[in-house]
Amino acid sequence: NMAAEQDQVNAMTTIGWNYFLGGKGAEQNNEEAIYWNERASKLGFSIASYNIGFFYYSGLAGLEQDLLKAKKYWLLSASQWIDSLNHGDSTPEGLLEEINSFNKNPSKEMIELRDWFIKLLRSIPA
């Protein structure tokens, strides 16, 4: 059942994000945040792949900043984005806003990577 599977990866991703932020019934826990997003990413869910890339990009969830790993996950996210089921109601604009709100003083490399990723998502037919 596609819908059930879809709900499942969506739920995993939401659980992972709640562990990252702490709240909505989840104690802040970086290992759990990464674990649930990794699982959903492996199942093809674009937003989970984006989240892991976002953690590497921002140096969050207990990960060292690593723009190469961020790019790898964001490329994966873009390749999974094609099917709207795989990114829920997320939009490139929404992700851009989120990236910016967590990264107030991005380096030149960060700005280039961010702009490349958002442009890539925008190029995918809705």
Regions found by a protein language model. Give the residues of each.
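Short helix-capping/linker turns of helical repeat alpha-solenoids
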Residues: E5-V9, G22-G23, N29, K42-F45, ...
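Hydrophobic face of amphipathic alpha-helices that form TPR/SEL1-like repeat modules
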Residues: T14-G22, S49-S58, G94, E98-F102
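Short coil/turn connectors between adjacent alpha-helices in alpha-solenoid helical repeat scaffolds
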Residues: L21-N30, L60-L67, S107-E109
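Terminal, low-structured helical/coil segments at or just beyond the last alpha-helical repeat
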Residues: L85-A126
